[in-house]
């Protein structure tokens, strides 16, 4: 019998999408193990179906990067990896500046950036309260 032409194209497209998804997951797992996020962030998604997966994986990867790397290394790569564009990385850096480095001015700047970007979450208010208590402790 005859087979519709567009069904063959759909199978090829679906196979290509699945192959890209598996490549994306392999790159993500590799980046999680090594914490070398550069190649994953440079990866360009070809199919729109995988865009959501790439965005979510990028957010998780950036969050893990800001938690596990040293604060100095994270601060030096802010521009390179565009860490200020992600809510989790902003909050992680602010929390680490408050608790580890005791750099309250930098933490306040990061929280102001989060406020400017519209990241109004409970975590923002909790960090501001923590900053107020650490910066000006009650007597």
Swiss-Prot record:
Name the record gives this protein: Uncharacterized protein ECU03_1200
Lineage of the organism: Eukaryota, Fungi, Fungi incertae sedis, Microsporidia, Unikaryonidae
Domain of life: Eukaryota
Organism field: Encephalitozoon cuniculi (strain GB-M1) (Microsporidian parasite)
């Amino acid at each position: 019998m005859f087979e519709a032409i567009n069904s063959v194209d759909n199978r090829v497209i679906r196979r290509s999408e699945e192959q890209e998804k598996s490549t994306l997951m392999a790159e993500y797992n590799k980046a999680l193990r090594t914490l070398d996020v550069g190649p994953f962030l440079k990866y360009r998604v070809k199919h729109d179906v995988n865009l959501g997966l790439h965005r979510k994986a990028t957010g998780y990867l950036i969050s893990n990067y800001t938690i596990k790397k040293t604060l100095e290394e994270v601060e030096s790569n802010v521009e390179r990896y565009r860490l200020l564009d992600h809510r989790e990385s902003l909050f992680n850096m602010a929390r680490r500046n408050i608790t580890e480095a005791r750099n309250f001015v930098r933490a306040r700047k990061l929280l102001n950036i989060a406020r400017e970007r519209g990241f109004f979450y409970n975590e923002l208010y909790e960090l501001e309260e923590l900053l107020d208590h650490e910066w000006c402790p009650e007597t």
